[in-house]
């Protein structure tokens, strides 16, 4: 049974529908707790990663396959496997249950009812975590990958905005990211979610060199024609575009299902328990006047939005197929964290939609399915683009973040120059594993994470974002200065100390950084499987 098959299937509609989810958070472990830091990770884990994987597991148990395409960034995957994060998550779930227990004993009937609801949810989450997740997320996700429930999309280490990245570091970040995926899940992804859907001409050649066959862009990058994937320039690498008409039906910068009055309000907290007691009620209703959350009302809205989405996809498939004279592809793409973290009812909606679409005669599949089935058109001369504001690079390269752009350029140049000088000093010798170089590249990649510029541009915890970028830049400079002044022992101690602080990407190997000349690797070729 594939995603395109289900009980009571209606007349088959033309074309194929692909749902793509992008799962990502920056590295948060040991970098603050509240209001920004590990709490962000644990909230997303409890509200999104646990319930969404449970939805997929239930559907997989029914024999359904190739339901959606799931991107998981290496930096998020690392946190889902990290012992510190696993311990922190276990503690967070226990605390959630205690808070729910406290709410169940409150004088307010509405809070007591909410407490009972939350206690059941926290108990189920604890059981799921202790049964399946306690030793890391890789095993949970690998079951879904092995069963072909999902197609896995990979990506570069630490989620850099690739168009602004030095080509050598861009290539290194991507190959290391794909190797990280293989180490965790036993699969090397053939497709990637390019961070922020960022693109500049020439990147397609790097993708081809890394073995990437397809990637996501936003719809306007393909001039709005997303009815097929498009080979990029003269390569065989295919860009699939997000259909904004369908995607924006669910969530857009201005509207979407989660804003319905009956759904749980994300922003309103009961400060005694930390629980969210209210429904949206209305866009302009202040927090203190919002009505209590009612699951029954939310369920009615949810069913309407499932039906609305199925009808939206059906209309789009029919209209695009008629317009192009061939079966059309419709790709809807979202941040995974929308489902549960931002939109409490999102996982329920997701499960209902993945059942309802096939029942309505709509074929669903993955991006790899779409490529294999021939949903590919003529080549496109893809230009600079992203899925950010304006669909250009302003979020990551605009005036508001010029300080970060300059910081990133300086840090990257410092790291590359330091490693190049070390290689030049021993041109005839095999390059041995150098933990100092490894840590320099880790800190460089953490500095250039796209998250920091995004947070500053959106004025969302901008101070935290700038602090994180400068902290990693400081670590890089400190190590590089020790190397440049010939203090090798100091450089090694610093590298060990900074590595211990994060413990991130232990398999990263600086020997795989390409050399100065295009198309070359370092003095010694080292496979991505080497330790």
Residues covered by each model-derived region:
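Short, solvent-exposed turn/loop segments enriched in Gly/Ser/Thr/Pro and often Arg
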Residues: 71-76, 156-158, 191-200, 367-372
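Hydrophobic, small-residue-rich alpha-helical packing segments that form membrane-like cores
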Residues: 203-212
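CE4/NodB-like, metal-dependent polysaccharide N-deacetylase domain
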Residues: 170-194, 312-333
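Conserved short loop/turn motifs at secondary-structure junctions
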Residues: 188-199, 335-339, 461
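Active-site and substrate-binding clefts of carbohydrate-active enzymes
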Residues: 8-65, 72-116, 120, 226-531
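Glycine-rich phosphate-binding "P-loop"
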Residues: 154-176, 180
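His/Asp/Glu-enriched short active-site or ligand-binding loop at hydrolase and phosphoryl-transfer sites
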Residues: 213-224, 363-366
């Amino acid at each position: 049974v594939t995603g395109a098959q289900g009980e009571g299937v209606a007349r088959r509609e033309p074309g194929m529908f692909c749902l793509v989810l992008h799962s990502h958070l920056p590295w948060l472990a040991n970098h603050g707790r509240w209001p920004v830091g590990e709490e962000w990770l644990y909230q997303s884990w409890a509200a999104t990663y646990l319930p969404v994987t449970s939805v997929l597991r239930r559907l997989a148990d029914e024999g359904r396959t190739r339901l959606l395409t799931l991107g998981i960034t290496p930096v998020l995957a690392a946190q889902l496997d990290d012992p510190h994060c696993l311990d922190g998550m276990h503690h967070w779930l226990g605390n959630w249950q205690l808070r729910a227990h406290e709410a169940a004993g409150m004088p307010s009937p509405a809070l007591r009812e909410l407490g009972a609801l939350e206690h059941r949810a926290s108990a189920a989450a604890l059981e799921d975590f202790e049964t399946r997740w306690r030793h890391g997320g890789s095993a949970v996700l690998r079951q879904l990958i092995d069963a072909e429930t999902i197609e896995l999309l990979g990506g570069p280490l630490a989620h850099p905005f690739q168009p602004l990245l030095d080509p050598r570091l861009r290539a290194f970040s991507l190959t290391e990211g794909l190797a990280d995926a293989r180490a965790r899940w036993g699969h090397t992804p053939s497709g990637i979610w390019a961070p922020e859907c960022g693109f500049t001409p020439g990147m397609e050649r790097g993708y081809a060199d890394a073995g990437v066959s397809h990637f996501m862009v936003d719809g306007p990058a393909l001039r709005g024609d997303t009815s097929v994937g498009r080979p990029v320039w003269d390569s065989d690498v295919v860009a699939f575009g997000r259909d904004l008409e369908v995607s924006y039906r669910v969530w857009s910068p201005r509207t979407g299902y989660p804003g319905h009055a009956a759904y749980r309000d994300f922003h309103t907290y009961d400060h005694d328990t930390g629980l969210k007691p209210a429904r949206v009620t209305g866009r302009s209703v202040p927090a203190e006047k919002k009505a209590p959350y009612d699951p029954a009302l939310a369920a009615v809205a949810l069913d309407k939005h499932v039906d609305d989405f199925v009808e939206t996809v059906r209309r789009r498939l029919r209209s695009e197929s008629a317009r192009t004279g061939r079966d059309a592809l419709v790709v809807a793409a979202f941040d995974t964290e929308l489902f549960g973290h931002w939109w409490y009812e999102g996982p329920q909606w997701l499960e209902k939609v993945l059942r309802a679409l096939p029942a309505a005669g709509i074929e669903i599949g993955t991006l790899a399915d779409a490529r294999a089935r021939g949903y590919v058109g003529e080549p496109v001369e893809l230009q600079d683009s992203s899925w950010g504001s304006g669909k250009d690079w302003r979020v990551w390269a605009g005036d508001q973040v010029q300080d970060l752009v300059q910081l990133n350029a300086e840090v990257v140049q410092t790291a590359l120059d330091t490693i190049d000088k070390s290689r030049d000093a021993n041109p005839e010798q095999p390059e041995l594993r150098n933990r100092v170089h490894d840590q320099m590249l880790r800190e460089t990649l953490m500095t250039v994470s796209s998250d920091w510029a995004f947070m500053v541009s959106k004025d969302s915890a901008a101070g935290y974002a700038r602090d994180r970028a400068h902290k990693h830049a400081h670590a890089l400079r400190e190590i590089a200065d020790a190397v440049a002044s010939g203090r090798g022992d100091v450089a090694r101690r610093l590298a060990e100390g900074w590595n211990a602080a994060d413990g991130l990407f232990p398999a990263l190997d600086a020997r795989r950084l390409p050399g100065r000349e295009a198309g070359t690797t370092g003095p010694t070729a080292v496979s991505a499987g080497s330790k």
